[in-house]
Amino acid sequence: MEQTHGICPTLSTAAAYDRCTTVRTRLGGTDLFGVSWRISPCPLRLSADELQFFSALGPHLLSFYRGLNRLYNESVKGLQPTWVAAYLDQGKPESLLQYSRMKRFRDEVPAVIRPDVIPTQDGMVITELDSVPGGIGLTACLSQIYHDLDEGHSQIIGGRDGMVRNFARMLRSHQAQRAGCVAILVSEESKDYRPEMLWLAEQLRKEGLSAWCVEPREIRFTEDGLWLDADGHEQPIGVVYRFYELFDLLNIPKAELIQYAAKKGRVAVTPPYKPALEEKSAFALFHHPILRPFWEKELEAECMTQLTRVIPKTWLLDPAPLPAIATIPDLYLGPRAVARWTDLENATQKERQFVIKPSGFSELAWGSRGVSVGHDLPQAEWGDALRNALASFPTTPYILQAFHKGRLFEMEFLDEGKAAVVQMSGRTRLSPYYFVSDGTVKLAGILATICPADKKVLHGMKDAILAPCAVQTS
């Protein structure tokens, strides 16, 4: 019997319904969030131990990013295996690689850290890291709404305004002594997230930070820096929050001017232009036995132990042939070691407990696009997915990752068709948001996405419940 986790055991049916309609009304009142998910009457409650896990995870992941950054830089210089940088650079334009390696940006790592965490029967598992995540504004808005439902008694993780205030603190730390405002640049490719970023910019202004969400084409370049028109007044830009993907740079108006301004120190840009730090194959590098001495030296013992526990086994799907006597490290089909990727094509459904997905730098590398779950596919389709991944290596490397099944949660949501609150059995993705300010990490909030139990890939969808997380009270 899998563990279940109810969230609103003390609410009457009428009270639960009223709370859902209040949430829907508040969201509708923003005129920004088209509610395309199921609304729960309560936040998802985590235990004190689970909160402790997430509080400790942020510093561990910052250490991981710093270690990955060092590993890449040392690989470029030949101080670590050169194949590390070769893999992380695969499929990237040379101009971007040279820019990312500039001395000015050498120590920069993402200031927003958001792992996707799956609660399983055996503990938490991180499926991937996202340094350009959506959901910041949405999680901030939901945190405010659910906090207000209980007049602050629900103990929302991060607090009512934790997402906004910690995001503002992170941006101020990047601004340092630079004059000017914050420009949240949202590309056309990311336009679905523009409403929440507009809302977030408004909240930042209420916190006293001059911040504006604009399209890249709206900014103006001069030799003195970047400018934007806000409320009828032209303002210098001190910080650019990059809400666009690096693979999309050729489609970003004025992208080269933004890079030039950052190179000259006229503006700070975060997340940094470092494609090596946005590859899912980083998890494969963490588990690679040749690199274990590096990680053990780079990370503190507790950090190494915890990350080994939560980062799933991952392999980069490189089609290069292995010597006849070699095997792929720690990859097995049952008791059998795997020496060739083609061995996986004939794996049974039970043996296909794997996920194939693009490593990064591709429009297929976010959301559920490009993801193939082995045991959820007929054998022929699994073979096709594997062969396609291997064939894509020159331009878009793919990874193979061990699949971990989420544990079941019993949730309640507002069924619009029935005009009633009903129960759903689902599996959960927890997305904690960490913001880095002056070298320290703060957990600002956690968004729960509860998908129907039959879904293998957990992501935002119309059949999913989205809710902030709170601390379970006794």
Predicted feature residues:
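Preference for protein termini
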Residues: 1-474
